[in-house]
Structures are given as structure tokens and as C-alpha cells.
Amino acid sequence: MSTTLALDIAAVLKKILAALVVVLATSYFLSMGLGLFLIYAMPQGLDAASRQVAELPFSVLMIVNFRIPLGVSVGFFFLMIWLLYTGAFALAWFDRPSFASSLRSLTRPDVWRSNYLVTLPQLASILFVAVVFLQALQESAGVQTGGISFESPVLGFLSISYAPLVEEFSYRITTIGILDGLNHIWKMHRVPSDKGRRNAIRLLILNIWKPERAKELLGYYTIRNDGVRRGISRFEWTVLVLTSGAFGAVHYLSGGGWEIGKISTAMLSGFAMGFVYLRYGAYAPILLHWFFNYYFGTFDLASQLNLAGGDFASFAVEFLNLGTGTLLVVATVAIYLMGTWSSKHHRT
């Protein structure tokens, strides 16, 4: 009877989780459309869109920072950002396994084997809850997080929308990707020199794009096939921690309104972004960072521009993500405790 009840509960939870994943994923796509509307249909958006972006801040390998002369309109620049995010979503959608098959076989232990668009709503909502909880805990102890402000809400939205692209390219794609790739090349078996050089270059490029694909090619353990404990090497854990720490520290040291409490929350987010990069590839950390900046930013901007229903939409997406994240945390803890109790019960 207890086994049947447990299976029934698991089936109900699976349906609820699948519904929440679909609702959250739908809200992601709605935010993409909303961003276009706010920039190209709202008067404040059109006014900002006519301005010029003279130069573009860029960064690689965390420490190499420079500016690229641009000279395009804000409207054109936002469209380029939007298309890059659309491309990232397309890569996630067409990646294997498919979104539909992952949704049908949705179970908590297999989350890292799922399509990223099934994993993202779960991970992002849990991370959102963790960041909110950590920030509240710190501020209750007098450690402030701070925040950044902009003279124009539209230009502020443009700035935070661009940040995931440049920051993920700098901290995850080039730093983790190149260091991890060089580590794999160093460990490769000896081959004839010309072939070895060609293989090394291809392997490095593949590792930057999709670290798991490179590891599969070399016959190494992967997260998807072998789990987290075996699928991430000690070297990768080390690089992941170091880049996450640097990501957190830079947010505070760069100023702009952030206070010391930002270090821990940014480090936590950076760790999650680095992790999904190792599992899914270059598009994954961009979309997780997009969730915090563009996704919430669109609904917040809609509220600031007094769009009809903007206040409610902004509240609703925060409530939905907090609720989903809390439910997942509680369910995960409950499943773990039930498993622990069951194993002890069988032993006795």
C-alpha cells in the first residue's frame, strides 16, 4: 500500500512539475516578445532607440577588457542582442534530447539528462530562491547587497540585457572553456605531431562550444552519462570555484552601487552558470544569466513604463518563480529524507 501511495504521489508531482515547466518556459518566450514591444512600440522605448551606441565594452578571459567602436543606434543594438538570445533558445530547443521527450520523462534524479529548456525553469527558480534567501539572510545581519541605478529605465534595461552576453563570454566560455580544453589537450595520448596539432585545435574549439562533447570524444566521464560526481573532474571543480569567486568579487570591486553582499550572491549565480556551461555548452550560462537580467528586466521595465498590467505581470513572474523554486526545494529535501528513512527501515 505504501509503495502504491508513493508511486501515486510521484505521478502527481511529476504532472505538477511538468505543468510548471511549461508555464515558466512560456513566460520566457512572452518576455522576449514583450522586450520588442517595449523598445519599438512604447514612446519611451522609441525615444531611447533613436540614440547612438558609440562604443561597446567587451571582455575575454576575465581580465582582458577593452572597448569596441560601434556607432549604431540603440534600436539596432537591442535587436542584435535579442537575436542572439533567440539563437540561444533555438540551440537549446533543438539540442538532444528534445524538449518534448524530456518533459514526458521528467524526474528529479534525471534532470541533468533533460533538454536544457526543461532543466532551466527548475534550476533558475531554485537559484532565484537561493539568491533571495541568501540576500535576506545577509541583510538581516547588516551585510548590504546594494544595487545599480540608471538615468533612463530603457537604457538601464539595455545595459543589463547586454551584460549576460559579454560576462558569460568572458568568465565561462573563454576562461573555463579554454582552460578546460587546454587541460584535455595536455592529457591527450601522444599522436603524430601534425595530426596532433590539428586535433588539438579542433578539440579546443569543441571544448569551448560544448565541453561535454569534447569529453565524450576523449572517452572521459560526463555529467550526462555518469552523473555530477564522476562527470566533473577536480580540475574543472577548481576552475569553476575560481571563476565564480572572481565573478562575485568583480561585481563588488567594479562599483556602480553594488556593496559587499553582492559577492556571495554573484558567486553563487556564477557557480551555477559555470556548471550548466560544463554540462550543456555555451548557450546554457547565457540563458541562465538572461533569466536574471532580461527576463525579470522586461517585466520590471513594463511596470516602470506604466504599461497596462505591468505591475501585476512583474509581481506574477516573481511569485511564480519563487513558488516553483520553493516547491522544488521542499520536494527535493522530502525525497532525500524519505529515501534515507526507507534505507534505514529496510536495514532494520
Regions inferred by a protein language model and the residue ranges of each:
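Transmembrane helix-loop-helix hairpins at the membrane interface
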Residues: 153-347
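N-terminal, membrane-interfacial amphipathic/helix-forming hydrophobic leader that caps
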Residues: 1-117, 132, 136-140, 297-348
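Alpha-helical transmembrane spans of integral membrane proteins, capturing the lipid-embedded, hydrophobic core
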Residues: 20, 24-28, 78-86, 116-128, ...
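Alpha-helical transmembrane segments and their membrane-interface junctions
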Residues: 126-146, 241-258
